Amino acid sequence: METLLSFSAIAVGIIVGLASLGTAIGFALLGGKFLEGAARQPEMAPMLQVKMFIIAGLLDAVPMIGIVIALLFTFANPFVGQLAG
C-alpha cells in the first residue's frame, strides 16, 4: 500500500513537472516566433498579437489538464480502491 502511494506521489511530480516544462518551452517558442514575425512585418504586429494570445490561452490549458490528473491521483487515487477491494 505504501509503495503504491509513493509511486503515485512520484507520478504526480512527473506529471506536474513535464506539463510545466512543456508549457514553458511552448511559450518560449511562441514568443520568439511572434517577435520574429513582428520584426519582419511591423504592420502585422496587432494581428499577430491577437493570434498569439489565442494560442497562448490554448497552450495554457495543457498544464491545467495535467494538474487535474495529478490532483485525481493525489486525492482520489483509483488504484487504492482496486488494491483494497
Swiss-Prot record:
Membrane topology: Multi-pass membrane protein
Segments passing through the bilayer: 10-30, 53-73
Keywords: ATP synthesis, Cell inner membrane, Cell membrane, CF(0), Hydrogen ion transport, Ion transport, Lipid-binding, Membrane, Transmembrane, Transmembrane helix, Transport
Pfam families: ATP-synt_C
Annotated positions for site Reversibly protonated during proton transport: D60
Entry's Gene Ontology cellular component terms: plasma membrane; proton-transporting ATP synthase complex; proton-transporting two-sector ATPase complex, proton-transporting domain
InterPro entries xrefs: ATP_synth_csu_bac/chlpt, ATP_synth_F0_csu, ATP_synth_F0_csu_DDCD_BS, ATP_synth_F0_csu_sf, ATPase_proteolipid_c-like_dom, F/V-ATP_Csub_sf
One GO MF term: proton-transporting ATP synthase activity, rotational mechanism
Cellular compartment(s): Cell inner membrane
Function: F(1)F(0) ATP synthase produces ATP from ADP in the presence of a proton or sodium gradient. F-type ATPases consist of two structural domains, F(1) containing the extramembraneous catalytic core and F(0) containing the membrane proton channel, linked together by a central stalk and a peripheral stalk. During catalysis, ATP synthesis in the catalytic domain of F(1) is coupled via a rotary mechanism of the central stalk subunits to proton translocation.
Family to which this protein belongs: Belongs to the ATPase C chain family.
Subunit details: F-type ATPases have 2 components, F(1) - the catalytic core - and F(0) - the membrane proton channel. F(1) has five subunits: alpha(3), beta(3), gamma(1), delta(1), epsilon(1). F(0) has three main subunits: a(1), b(2) and c(10-14). The alpha and beta chains form an alternating ring which encloses part of the gamma chain. F(1) is attached to F(0) by a central stalk formed by the gamma and epsilon chains, while a peripheral stalk is formed by the delta and b chains.
Annotated protein name in UniProt: ATP synthase subunit c
Organism: Aliivibrio fischeri (strain ATCC 700601 / ES114)
Gene: atpE
